[in-house]
């Protein structure tokens, strides 16, 4: 476990034993003074918590204790790289981490922030486990296949996943992450997030999670903020629009950012996005 200090925040990282006995790596950023609330950040496919250091710093600087972890098979956590036999394993990881954060931040209101595939993990977690949350924030959530994924390909994915679960099929186009060249370059050089396609089973489980969320989206009743860039080619903005319409939440908001690519938190207007999230969080605490 390590911990570093900055003038206004404290940051650190460590690890704990996750469901099934694997090692799960975690990160945290806390304000030096008493935190107003806690935020848990859930990253996406082939992603990891350390890439959100600037996000953790931002929220800690605005009074929010921020916690992130590397999903199994991602970042510095144990597990076969980017492989998951069932999406419920990611949900189990998050469930364990939420309990851990609640122990560290007793009595604090808790928000969940899920990005990309992490948005699907967070959404399914809320639907299945019914946690006591102050609100849910979804950044470019993976809720519906993109236009280039045909119904035939979706059907075939189940067959490929069954017989060739580790076949490399799910590729992430790094150039579609952001307009910022430095973000693309950093992603290319990141040894924890390489350009190797993810396994077929993982891709199929993501598609299955999308369907499960669509089937139960009307059960969402907690405050929810959904954000998507209209230029996103990695996750479908239509999925965010549909979730906004179908969610039963009385307190729900959809924000579309014209022309922005997939990583809203690593984009040309990332400060605006962070300000929008912070304002939304602040308003839920009043």
How does the language model describe each region?
Residues 253-286:
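Catalytic active-site module of serine/aspartate enzymes centered on a nucleophile-bearing elbow/loop
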Residues 220, 226-228, 232:
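Short beta-strand/loop motif that positions the catalytic acidic residue
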Residues 105-115:
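Alpha/beta-hydrolase fold nucleophile elbow
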Residues 56-79:
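Conserved alpha/beta-hydrolase
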